[in-house]
């Protein structure tokens, strides 16, 4: 007996898992994990499946994290939110804004659950989760012990954290603590946001602009399956960036604090005339080259082949090698996504 994973991944790829368990509290997560472990099965915890690509049938148990609840504590200088890992991220952004607690608006419409946000250190339009994260509560799967990691202990990086490294497969995230400062400062460094006046802009205007940019450029997973940005924006050494800018002076680039330079993967892909290119049922989105879509009953092999093609074309033209942001899941767990498309 197997269960289809199609409803549980936004790519809409039709693979199966041996078991699927829905967990509404910590105990249910632990019970499902212990049961799978006793049976010698692999086990993974999934939010809304908006950042994964299942490469094949999963041989174990998929636990759907559905822990809910939002608590707010106000202090003199900030609002402190304690949010269940299974809450929808965008609904949280709206909730905060509706209750006059700004600070999350640049992160509007990022798909997925709150519990997934620290794993990737989600980010968009100049803001990353680490800017507002206070702590992450998790439970050790083997012992059932509760842990609270401060933001510093989460070791956030660009689309990276301790949860993708030492703590991968060892803990389940049960809640995230956010600190939204009452001294709100808009971040208007990207896209249409640069046109807004920092002196008069409201959080609602930032939210509206972000939603407009995302809905006009990004495909709706309900129409064309996708996992949002498929590739990370590459971060390269300054000398490589200089070399590239000598050849392509109009290439978007964002100097980083450590001297490296972040490039725009979407622009690099676009320069290779790859928008609309298809392999099997998978396609490069026509509006946003960074997004690969399930255009016509794509298989995971189609998506991997297309990602490989994109990576090769960009690498040959720019000598910059893209890495997937999407996590690749094999038969018994996560596999190296770069190796899968190299």
From Swiss-Prot:
Subcellular location: Cytoplasm
Pfam family, one: MurB_C
Entry cofactors: FAD
Any Gene Ontology biological process: cell wall organization
Main location: cytoplasm
Annotated EC: 1.3.1.98
Residues at the active site: 159, 229 (proton donor), 325
GO cellular component: cytosol
Catalytic activity: UDP-N-acetyl-alpha-D-muramate + NADP(+) = UDP-N-acetyl-3-O-(1-carboxyvinyl)-alpha-D-glucosamine + NADPH + H(+)
Ranges of residues in domain FAD-binding PCMH-type: 13-183
EC supergroup of this enzyme: oxidoreductase
Keywords: Cell cycle, Cell division, Cell shape, Cell wall biogenesis/degradation, Cytoplasm, FAD, Flavoprotein, NADP, Oxidoreductase, Peptidoglycan synthesis
Family note: Belongs to the MurB family.
Function: Cell wall formation.
PANTHER family reported in the protein's UniProt record: UDP-N-ACETYLENOLPYRUVOYLGLUCOSAMINE REDUCTASE
Protein name: UDP-N-acetylenolpyruvoylglucosamine reductase
Organism of provenance: Salmonella choleraesuis (strain SC-B67)
């Amino acid at each position: 007996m197997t269960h289809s994973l199609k409803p549980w991944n936004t790519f809409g790829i039709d693979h199966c898992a041996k078991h699927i368990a829905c967990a509404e509290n910590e105990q249910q997560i632990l019970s499902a994990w212990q049961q799978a472990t006793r049976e010698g099965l692999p086990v993974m915890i999934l939010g809304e499946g908006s950042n994964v690509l299942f490469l094949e049938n999963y041989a174990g148990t998929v636990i759907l994290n559905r822990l809910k609840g939002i608590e707010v504590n106000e202090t003199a200088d900030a609002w402190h939110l304690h949010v269940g890992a299974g809450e929808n991220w965008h609904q949280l952004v709206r909730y905060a804004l509706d209750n006059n607690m700004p600070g999350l608006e640049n992160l509007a419409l990022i798909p997925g659950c709150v519990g997934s946000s620290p794993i990737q250190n989600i980010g968009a339009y100049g803001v990353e989760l680490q800017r507002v994260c206070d702590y992450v509560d998790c439970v050790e799967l083997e012992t059932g012990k509760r842990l609270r990691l401060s933001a510093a202990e989460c070791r956030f990086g660009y689309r990276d954290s301790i949860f993708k490294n030492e703590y991968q497969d060892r803990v389940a995230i049960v809640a995230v603590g956010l600190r939204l400062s009452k001294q709100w400062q808009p971040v208007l460094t990207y896209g249409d946001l640069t046109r807004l006046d920092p002196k008069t802009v409201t959080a609602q205007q930032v939210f509206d602009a972000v939603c407009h940019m995302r809905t006009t450029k990004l495909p709706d997973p309900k129409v064309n399956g996708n996992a949002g940005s498929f590739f990370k924006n590459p971060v390269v050494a300054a000398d490589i960036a200089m070399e590239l800018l000598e050849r392509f002076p109009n290439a978007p680039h964002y100097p980083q604090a450590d001297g490296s330079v972040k490039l725009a993967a979407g622009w690099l892909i676009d320069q290779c005339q790859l928008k609309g290119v298809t392999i099997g049922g998978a396609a490069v989105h026509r509006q946003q080259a960074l997004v690969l879509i399930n255009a016509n009953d794509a298989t995971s092999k189609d998506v991997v082949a297309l990602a490989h093609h994109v990576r090769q074309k960009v690498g040959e033209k720019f000598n910059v090698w893209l890495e997937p942001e999407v996590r690749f899941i094999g038969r018994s767990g996560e596999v190296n996504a770069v190796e899968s498309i190299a």
